[in-house]
Design a protein with these regions (language model features):
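Polybasic, glycine- and aromatic-enriched phosphate-binding surface used to engage nucleic acids
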Residues: 1-106, 111-117, 122-134
Length: 134
C-alpha cells in the first residue's frame, strides 16, 4: 500500500533504511515445542510499518538482512528470546539475552551450538522446547 510521506508521523528517517521486521504478536499457544516468533521479513528502503511489526535491526544490504533472518530462525536465537518472553507480545526487551552475530554470513544451529560450547544435553533441551522454523 502506498502512503504519502507527509502521513508518516514518527521515525520518518527509518523509511530510507533497510530493515528486518517481525510481527509483534507471536503464533502458537502453550503446547511444546514453541515457535516463539512469526516468520521475519526483510523490508527494503521506502518501506514503513505500523505497530503491528517490530523492527529487529537495520542492515546495510539485503544479504545482511537474509543472514539476520537465518539467525532469527535458529532454535538457539528463539530459545534465548524465550528466556524473557512470557506473553505472545514481542517487545524489544525480549532480545536482551540474544547475542549479536556477524551478519555477513548466514547462521545455523549447529554453528551456534559449537560457537557457544553447548553440551549435548543443553542442545537436546533447546530442541525439545523450540520447534524448527521452515
Amino acid at each position: 500500500v502506498f502512503i504519502e510521506p507527509r502521513y508518516i508521523t514518527k521515525n520518518i528517517a527509518w523509511k530510507d533504511k533497510k530493515k528486518v521486521l517481525v510481527s509483534k504478536a507471536s503464533p502458537g499457544g502453550d503446547e511444546y515445542p514453541h515457535s516463539i516468533i512469526s516468520t521475519p521479513l526483510y523490508a527494503d528502503v521506502n518501506t514503513v510499518c505500523t505497530e503491528t511489526y517490530l523492527i529487529v535491526d537495520f542492515v546495510n544490504n539485503k544479504i545482511e538482512g537474509q543472514n539476520l533472518i537465518s539467525y532469527m530462525t535458529t532454535r538457539f536465537f528463539r530459545f534465548m528470546m524465550s528466556l524473557i518472553k512470557n506473553t505472545q507480545n514481542i517487545s524489544k526487551g525480549v532480545f536482551a539475552f540474544v547475542p549479536i552475530q556477524d551478519y555477513s554470513k548466514s547462521w545455523t544451529d549447529e554453528e551456534l551450538y559449537a560457537k557457544y560450547g553447548l553440551t549435548k544435553e543443553e542442545i537436546a533441551f533447546i530442541e525439545s522446547m523450540i520447534r524448527p522454523m521452515k
